[in-house]
Amino acid sequence: NISNGTERDFAKIMNQYASKLQMKNTSFKNASGLPNRAQMTTARDIALLSHALIKNFPEKYKYFKQEKFKWKGKIYKTHNKLMLNYQGADGIKTGYIKDSGFQLAFSAKRNEKRLIGVYFGGDTGRQRDKSLKIIMDKVYGDLNLPTTKKEEKEVKIKIKNNSYAIVVGTFKYKKNAEK
């Protein structure tokens, strides 16, 4: 327990951590991520949080790639269908809120190159997964790494580190992203 036991206190701690990560457009109001008019974030900020999770908490990150787990006698299965079908996938989190549609924070690692993709605004979970898969494949292709497609092309780029982030739809509301 890292708070005084209240959700408000927990959200305060989350906001302090978000500030340390330079998540400049995020305000947490609850621990669940369920809708709250005062709670907001961006795809960029979720990418920062995802990167910090992977880097700073590797012992906890293993839980984000589980296909299923058992809790109090009940088996729970992941909603992250892309993770089940994407080469190198190892997590992170799906979501849905009416105002911003189907969302996904996603990570994959191939040949020691990790990509973090964050997608907001999907009309369906399937459409969200398909769109993010296309983007991830494109970036891996540009890095000249294996993709889930069989097409090959040679691209030369200079790489400074092994972490990349893809941010799509950095809008609070889906309707703004479509303008």
Name these PLM-found stretches.
Residues 8-27:
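Short, charged, amphipathic alpha-helices and their helix-cap/turn boundaries
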Residues 23, 27, 35-162, 167-170, ...:
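Domain-terminus/edge residues, biased toward the C-terminal soluble/receptor-binding domains
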